[in-house]
Regions:
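Intrinsically disordered or low-complexity boundary/linker segments at protein termini
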Residues: 3-44, 132-315
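Extended, intrinsically disordered cytoplasmic tails
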Residues: 22-103, 107, 111-127
Length: 315
């Protein structure tokens, strides 16, 4: 009974901690607040590298909080302190290597997605960065886990018409991304890890006017990486604002030497082979993930970005 009582107290204290923070905070001038939410400890350090390259050279000072949420039923309350120490070890090591000061935050939750959105919305964050989990990952362990989950679904659940989002990685990622974007009052990035180290060769996909915000993020990224960028203009001549989009793209590549507008109009495995990072807007991702599934098996590490039209956060 003692572990049970401890667990109840832990959940209560955690809920109270979240409530304490839930006083709406206005974003501070000159500060770009990023909430980086990670699951596995090793992923935290990789996502920190992404955040540092994406935001550290922005016009506003980067203020990053690393959040690790554990589902309540998975935690032994008597080992919480040790669990927290192990979870943040790699990301704190990464921060030290980068010369970054970061905040760490550990919570036990029974509704991780909602708690993450509550923290973002009530504490004045400008950006939410989350990982895709094993979805679309190309690590051997994650591929094996995905195959097992898919075969398990096909064998036991398909005949009962259970939702594919329970088991299929593409559907899981789509649902996860949609939830964070729908509930967060800030820009959101969902990171897909494909052995990410540094964004030295970045592919940027533009298919509509609403994707042009990616150019601002690209400009900041290049200040940190000093890499190169290739831009794919996926729109057609019938795309609304086609001429204006092209003008802005040409202005962009004309002003930044290490960028180029590619002749490619489609995303292919051959194109992906030349890049180690991709920036793509949320709506464009939804279209590409539906119609170019095979090609995406060869995609590089990718950050799916959504610009929140309700906020004016700007780094």
């Amino acid at each position: 009974t003692i572990p049970l009582v401890s667990f109840i107290k832990l959940c209560f204290k955690t809920r109270e901690k979240i409530k304490e923070h839930q006083v709406c905070v206005e974003p501070a001038d000159g500060i770009f607040k990023v909430l980086l939410s990670f699951g596995r400890a090793g992923n935290g350090q990789i996502m920190l590298d992404v955040a540092h390259q994406m935001f550290a050279r922005g016009k506003n000072k980067l203020d990053l909080t690393a959040l690790h949420l554990t589902v309540g039923s998975d935690v032994n309350p008597l080992h919480t302190d040790n669990f927290e120490e192990v979870s943040f070890g790699p990301i704190l090591y990464g921060a030290k290597k980068l010369g970054m000061h970061i905040h760490t935050r550990y919570e036990v939750s029974n509704n991780a997605g909602q708690d993450i959105c509550d923290i973002v919305n009530n504490e004045g964050f400008d950006f939410l960065l989350v990982g895709s989990g094993i979805s679309m990952s190309d690590s051997p362990d994650d591929i094996a886990a995905t195959r097992y989950r898919t075969s398990f679904y096909n064998r036991y659940f398909k005949r009962f018409k259970a939702p594919e989002s329970w088991f299929y990685p593409g559907a899981l990622l789509k649902d996860k991304t949609k939830m964070f974007i729908a509930r967060s009052n800030c820009d959101v990035g969902v990171f897909i890890n494909r052995n990410f180290v540094k964004a030295t060769n970045t592919l940027v996909v533009i298919s509509s006017e609403e994707d042009l915000f990616l150019l601002d993020y690209t400009r900041t990224l290049l200040k940190a990486t000093h890499g190169s960028v290739g831009i794919v203009a996926k729109m057609s001549t019938t795309t609304p604002g086609h001429d204006q989009i092209l003008k802005e793209l040409w202005d962009f590549v004309s002003s930044i030497p290490q960028t180029q507008l590619l002749p490619d109009k489609d995303l292919t495995p051959g194109l992906f082979n030349s890049y180690n990072f991709m920036l793509i807007g949320y709506n464009t991702w939804n279209d590409v993930s539906e119609h170019r599934k095979e090609a995406l098996q060869k995609m590089p590490s990718t950050l799916i970005l959504n610009k929140n039209r309700r906020s004016s956060s700007d780094n």
